[in-house]
Amino acid sequence: MKRFTRDEIAQRVARDIPEGAYVNLGIGLPTLVANHLDASKEIFLHSENGILGMGPAPAPGQEDEDLINAGKQPVTLLTGGAYFHHADSFSMMRGGHLDICVLGAFQVSKTGDLANWHTGAPDAIPAVGGAMDLAIGAKRVFVMMELQTKTGESKLVGECTYPLTGIACVSRVYTDLAVIDIHPDALIVREMADGVTLPALQKIIGLPLQAA
């Protein structure tokens, strides 16, 4: 079966972000979304280190060492963009002022619980950052992730076994095989990669799925 590439996943997320939305892009895979937003839409990107009005990655050779996102990657600033204190940034996150946040994940449960800061492994370095604030503070939480671990287990699970970031906070999951909405009583498959069938997807995930 064919899988969506990381950029294709980012394109799919970008397509679902509406005009006028205030959006935080988490560290890692979610940062790719900035490069695929429709230029005709006015969308305000927020970074927790204190940026609002963040643009896409700069062209090679045009990087500004003083302009980076929370993941320390070079970014650009759109006309009208602003810098501000870290405390003000977290006030925006915690105060319910963000319409959408896009986060990566180690696990997402069938009820929308999110685990994305620690695997519990003794040699792993916990890195919660602002994820808990975003997971609870944003009006909607989108997750971008590969559906399976390196050993083939589904990251979409009945119940998270890793430490939780937030409870019942994830509304939609974008993966390399499918886009899945999380509802209190069902997992609804919105879209699948070419060659992927609902029975095959259900076998990988191991949970009941419904077609949209």
PLM-predicted stretches and their roles:
Residues 4-8, 59-212:
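Conserved phosphate- and dinucleotide-binding cores of soluble alpha/beta proteins
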